[in-house]
C-alpha cells in the first residue's frame, strides 16, 4: 500500500501531536519526582501536608460567609498551617482559625488572613511570579538551600516556611526582601538552633 505525501504528512502531524502529550506527562512527572526527592521532609510528611491543606481549606469553605465573601488558602509544613487570603471582617478571620484548628493533624495555625476585598486574578499571577523569583534567587544565592524553604506569596507579601537555622532564616528573608514587588516578608519557620 502506497501512501500519498499528504497522508504521510497527516500521519506524521498526528503522531507528533500525540507524542507531545506523552512528553509533557514525562516532564511533569519528572518535575514532581524531583520536588519530592529534594524536599527535606519525608515523602509521607509531604503527602500528609498536602492532605492537611486540602482538609483545612475544605473545613474553612464550609462556612457560608467565608465561601461567599472570602478567599482562604492553607499552606502546611510539618503540620503547621499558615492561612493566607482575604476575609470580610475579623470575626470571619477568627472563625477560619477555629475551623483550621479543628482539623485532625493540625499542630499550629498561623493566621495571616487580611480583612480586605478578594485580590484579583492579576495579583494572584503577580504573586506566583514573586514566588518563582524568590525561589530562583535562593537557588543561586547559596546561603540557604532553596529546597529547605517553602515559599508562598499573597498580595505582594512573601511567606517563608520550613525547618531552618536562624542564619538560614535571616538569609532567606534577606533574599526575598530584595525582590522587586515584595511588600513584606513573613517568616513562619521552626528554628533548628
UniProtKB/Swiss-Prot annotation:
Lipid attachment, kind N-palmitoyl cysteine: 22
Membrane topology of the entry: Lipid-anchor
Domain of life: Bacteria
BON domain location: 48-117, 126-193
Subcellular location: Cell outer membrane
InterPro entries listed in its UniProt record: BON_dom (IPR007055), Lipoprotein_DolP (IPR051686), Transpt-assoc_nodulatn_dom_bac (IPR014004)
Signal peptide: 1-21
Gene Ontology cellular-component annotations: cell outer membrane
Keyword vocabulary terms for this entry: Cell outer membrane, Lipoprotein, Membrane, Palmitate, Repeat, Signal
Statement: the UniProt record of this protein carries the keyword Transmembrane helix: no
NCBIfam families from the UniProt entry: PRK11023.1
Protein name: Outer membrane lipoprotein DolP
Species the sequence originates in: Haemophilus influenzae (strain ATCC 51907 / DSM 11121 / KW20 / Rd)
Taxonomic classification: Bacteria, Pseudomonadati, Pseudomonadota, Gammaproteobacteria, Pasteurellales
